[in-house]
């Protein structure tokens, strides 16, 4: 049996990435304060359709993701369909795979095209860290259910008497991994210690990311893939990511204190991604349908892979597991790639993965390979900056990476690119695209 992955439909046509778009990414409680993930999702999908001059009625499926779920609209995908002029019969469902969510939505649409069930679909994701599902304590939740069944005033009074003042306080969304109790920042700190990653190296990577992202915005390269967002009350607009340090100074990074291990730590707010609001989406078609409609795709999906590892130790190593599998399925080696886009959740996590890419020992012991994945050529790596600068709305990052690497390859005359990410739960994702 061949290890090669055939990302084609029954007619042998490739899966085309026709277009991609995102909102600007904004730090928590800034430009998108009060704007829900659903509203951002509708905003970007509608603008993507307008820019692409694609009739919404032609969309056969929309798969969309959200990590921080809102009880009021649990199926964000269906609400986007109903809010953007698509046919009411358009298939729509929501997915979640932590920080790899829109990798999953993209693959789901691609596989629907591969099986011949559809010809055109939209994938993406959105998250808001500013509009959050604030919960209640377990005791209050229990009491509220009992109140629905209580018939007399006396019964209701007895229920209220079970509650203390603390039970009435709101409960913010959990930031820790359910299985381990560790936050992502604590996991990054764990990885920094495991792989002996210095504070200086983490700060240097963050500085590089901000510097390159600022240069990219100044060059105008992102204007066609980042929309101008107008938000209520429509007196202001946002047209650029607001986390990027325009005058990044490496020396200033050293001034920040560790955020997760106050005494011995090295992970700080400056070398981590901030809580971020934003949305992104891509249009996928069969190669034949794209050609028939007159589109010139920005890229094609060559291979993809998802992996999972143990959550107790260094669980943000997803790229080191998913990338070699995607490369194998594409019949490629790391050195064959033109560009590499790796999600920078934390500088420590990114550097740990880069280190393991180059490790023969890791390849032998963890991957069952007789050679390392390969040394990363920094002239190919996150050449426009990464998540440390742009920010990280959890469900939106995957399709941001896919669009960005495709468009940059297009500017360079084509080639192949890797987009890869770690994710909570020990998950990993990787996709290889080819651009003509």
UniProtKB/Swiss-Prot annotation:
The active site is at 99 (acyl-thioester intermediate), 392 (proton acceptor), 422 (proton acceptor). It is an enzyme of class 2 (transferase). InterPro entries: Ac-CoA_C-AcTrfase_FadI, Thiolase, Thiolase-like, Thiolase_AS, Thiolase_C, Thiolase_CS, Thiolase_N. GO terms for biological process: fatty acid beta-oxidation. PROSITE patterns: THIOLASE_2, THIOLASE_3. Heterotetramer of two alpha chains (FadJ) and two beta chains (FadI). This is 3-ketoacyl-CoA thiolase. The gene is fadI.
């Amino acid at each position: 049996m061949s290890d090669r992955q055939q990302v084609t439909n029954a007619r042998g046509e490739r899966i085309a990435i026709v277009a991609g778009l995102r909102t600007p990414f904004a730090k928590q409680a800034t430009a998108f304060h009060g704007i829900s993930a659903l509203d951002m999702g509708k905003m970007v999908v509608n603008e993507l359709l307008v820019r692409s001059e694609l009739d919404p009625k032609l969309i056969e499926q929309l798969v969309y993701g959200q990590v921080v779920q809102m009880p009021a609209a649990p199926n964000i995908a269906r609400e986007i369909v109903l809010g953007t002029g698509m046919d009411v019969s358009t298939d729509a469902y929501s997915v979640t795979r932590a920080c790899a969510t829109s990798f999953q939505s993209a693959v789901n649409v691609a596989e629907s095209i591969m099986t011949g069930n559809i010809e055109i679909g939209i994938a993406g994701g959105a998250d808001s860290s500013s509009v959050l599902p604030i919960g209640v304590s377990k005791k209050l939740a229990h009491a509220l259910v009992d109140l629905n069944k209580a018939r007399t005033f006396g019964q209701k009074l007895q229920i209220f008497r079970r509650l203390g003042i603390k039970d009435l306080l709101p409960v913010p969304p959990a930031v820790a991994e359910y299985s381990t109790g560790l936050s992502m920042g604590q996991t990054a700190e764990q990885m920094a210690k495991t792989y002996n990653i210095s504070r200086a190296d983490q700060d240097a990577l963050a500085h590089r990311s901000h510097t390159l992202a600022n240069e990219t915005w100044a060059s105008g390269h992102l204007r066609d893939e980042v929309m101008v967002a107008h938000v209520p009350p429509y007196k202001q607009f946002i047209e650029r990511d607001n986390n990027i340090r325009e005058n990044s100074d490496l020396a200033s990074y050293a001034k920040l204190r560790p955020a997760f291990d106050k005494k011995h730590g090295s992970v700080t707010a400056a070398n981590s991604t901030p809580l971020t609001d934003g949305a992104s989406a891509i249009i996928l078609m069969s190669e034949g349908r794209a050609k028939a409609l007159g589109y010139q795709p920005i890229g094609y999906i060559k291979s993809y892979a998802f992996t999972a590892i143990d959550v107790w130790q260094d669980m943000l190593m997803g790229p080191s597991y998913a990338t070699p599998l995607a490369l194998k399925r594409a019949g490629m080696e790391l050195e064959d790639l033109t560009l590499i886009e790796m999600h920078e959740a934390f500088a420590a996590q990114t550097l740990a993965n880069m280190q393991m890419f180059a490790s023969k020992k890791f390849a032998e012991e963890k991957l069952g390979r007789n050679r390392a994945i390969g040394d990363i050529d920094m002239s190919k790596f996150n050449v426009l900056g990464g998540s440390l600068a742009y920010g990280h709305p959890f469900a939106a990052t995957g399709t941001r990476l896919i669009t960005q690497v495709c468009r940059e390859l297009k500017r360079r005359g084509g080639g192949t690119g890797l987009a890869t990410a770690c994710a909570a739960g020990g998950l990993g994702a990787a996709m290889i695209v080819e651009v003509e």
